[in-house]
Amino acid sequence: VYLFCAIFILINCTNKELTFIEDVDGLKVDSMDPFYHGVASGDPLENKVIIWTRVTPEKTLSEISVKWKMSESKDFNEIINEGVFITNSKRDYTVKVDVDKLSPGKIYFYKFEALGKESMVGRTKTISDSISSLKIAAISCSDYQRGFFNAYGSLADEDLDAVIHLGDYIYEYKSRDYSNGIFKR
């Protein structure tokens, strides 16, 4: 019975209702277009690391060509690795590249380009080939809709080997609808 009700509600949800939910949340920042989900990196090894982003097209496209670049400097004066990744709606327009030919224990900068626009610049680091110590930051549940999380900026300024996020970041409910009114938070 519950499954039938859920399917009925989803089938009868109109585009107007879906647009309203997006407008209420207000999470789109025009300056990030079409990279609204930002950039991320992970799974570092001594000579490679995975970089990730998602492109959000204004309309459904059969495929999107996404250029990516990796550099040792923020200004990308010298590109040490680059390529093109073809994404599509079956992948939800996500991009996941396993960048290789990197040096151990080095900081790298990366960015993406699609639909005539560039993403923000990401920073990543490969694992050292001789680990005598490891500097890790651990962060936990963060509700993007409920705060600014300035502490993340401080973490970005630290000389860390890794940041591990142990919780959720985006929750599935309307903005300002988390508390039940008792706590008023």
Locate predicted features.
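Bacterial N-terminal signal peptides
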Residues: 2-11
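N-terminal Sec signal peptide cleavage junction
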Residues: 13-16
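Divalent metal-dependent phosphoesterase catalytic cores across multiple superfamilies
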Residues: 18-185
